[in-house]
Design a protein with these regions (language model features):
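N-terminal Rossmann-like NAD(P) cofactor-binding module of classical short-chain dehydrogenase/reductase
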Residues: 73-78, 98-100
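ADP-ribose/adenylate-binding Rossmann-like module
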Residues: 90-107
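Conserved Rossmann-fold cofactor-binding substructure of NAD(P)-dependent oxidoreductases
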Residues: 58-70
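Rossmann-fold NAD(P)-binding glycine/threonine-rich loop
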Residues: 102-123
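C-terminal catalytic/substrate-binding lobe primarily of soluble NAD(P)-dependent oxidoreductases
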Residues: 142-392
């Protein structure tokens, strides 16, 4: 089996490499990235004998296609978001299946061409989106009528690492974190579509707190299009409530709302400066040095999914909980493991024909639940499920 990891030197890319080397080792792995300066560090904690580092320009679809054309069985795209479309178009051009962890909206237009070519393109297959969607796809089949589907997920520092004004440290792409603070969201509330524009993301009526076992109160912030997934899962006719939320320690919205109102997240370059810089670019460069984890600090991933409905005429509820902590021995972040391991599992499933559908796929429909959960547990990642049925 030959697998290419695009963006292999990034945080999630390293996690995917760890998985491909240590769990059911893959014979031939290509770590492709624009910058390979960290390769020596990788050799310090990972057996790299089956990994070949290759420099590739993610901004060039031609360069990506040339790499994937080298008898590759499947590729994993963990490049920065602006290069996502390049990776998918290159994979389709050369007929190589590809797994990505980004939202799939930009490449859904490729479905017919990919299906006709017999190529599997799997976006949204990381942590969130990813594990949450696989859980949702399984859960909806446990009801005769589904009425509520809420999904919560967030990466945050353990309590002892909360030593800055926003109680947050970087375990993900910081530019991506900033962009997620200006994302439109769509909910189902009382059976009706409710739009939360990005401008209202941190003041919306949908903001609330949840209690997460072992962590306590967490702030839930609007994050994503819940309506799309109710339609994808075929439950939009019965669902009365649906939402997708990010989780943070309380106080997150109180910090970001005034900054957003004052233009600090704007992408418009400022005039009168020595060079054109947008407020977003300024924050992207300014804040990371203040938000770094120390070697002895853990990041945490917390995920909660809630489902309510009817089975055999009785009320039924399902709650699933997932908690991942950083591995201090390897230094691998919980966020990286949740994203990179999931992508690596799905890539193997495609290469081994456990996933045979083609076109633009989705984890909620196309990743086999039991097999996937078995693979997660092999990696020490456990999903706890609580089921309550009225009258039992």
């Amino acid at each position: 089996m030959k697998i290419v990891v695009l963006g292999g030197m990034g945080m999630q890319g390293k996690a995917a490499l760890v998985d491909l080397v240590n769990i059911d080792p893959v014979d031939d792995i290509i770590c492709a990235d624009a910058d390979l300066k960290g390769w020596k560090q990788l050799e310090g904690f990972l057996d790299t004998s089956r990994i070949r580092p290759v420099q590739v320009d993610g901004s060039s679809p031609k360069a990506i296609a040339s790499l994937l054309a080298q008898d590759v069985d499947v590729a994993i795209d963990l490049l920065p978001l602006p290069f996502m479309v390049n990776a998918f178009e290159a994979a389709l051009e050369v007929g190589v299946p590809l797994v990505s962890t980004n939202y799939g909206k930009p490449i859904r237009r490729l479905h017919q061409a990919a299906a006709a070519a017999g190529v599997a393109l799997m976006p949204e297959c990381g942590l969130d989106p990813g594990i949450d969607l696989i859980i949702c796809g399984h859960a909806v089949r446990q009801f005769d009528r589904l009425e509520l589907i809420d999904s919560y997920c967030g990466g945050l520092p353990e309590r002892k690492a909360c030593d800055n004004p926003i109680n947050y440290k970087i375990s993900w792409n910081w530019d991506g974190v900033l962009r997620s603070q200006k994302r439109d969201s769509v909910f189902i509330e009382n059976g009706r579509r409710l739009e939360v524009p990005a401008a209202d993301q941190h003041t919306s009526q949908m903001i609330h707190q949840i209690e997460f076992p072992g962590l306590g109160a967490l702030e839930a912030i609007p994050n994503g299009d819940a309506e799309f997934y109710t339609e994808l899962l075929g439950v939009s006719a019965t669902v009365r409530q649906a939402g997708r939320y990010s989780l943070r320690w309380p106080g997150w919205c109180a910090f970001w709302q005034p900054l957003k109102a004052l233009g600090f997240l704007s992408d418009t370059p400022l005039t009168g400066l020595p060079c054109p810089v947008s407020p977003h670019q300024f924050l992207a460069e300014l804040m990371p040095p203040y938000l770094r984890y120390r070697d002895d600090e853990k990041d945490i991933v917390a995920m909660l999914n809630r489902f309510e409905g009817l089975i055999d005429g009785r009320k039924k509820s399902i709650r699933t909980y997932l908690l991942i902590e950083r591995d201090l021995q390897t230094g691998l972040f919980a966020m990286s493991a949740g994203v990179g391991f999931t992508a690596a599992i799905a890539a193997r499933m495609i290469a081994r024909k456990l996933i045979t559908a083609t076109g633009v796929l989705n984890p909620a429909l196309d990743v086999p639940y039991e097999a996937f959960m078995s693979e997660l547990s092999r990696r020490g990642i456990m999903v706890k499920e609580e089921v309550v049925v009225e009258g039992t």
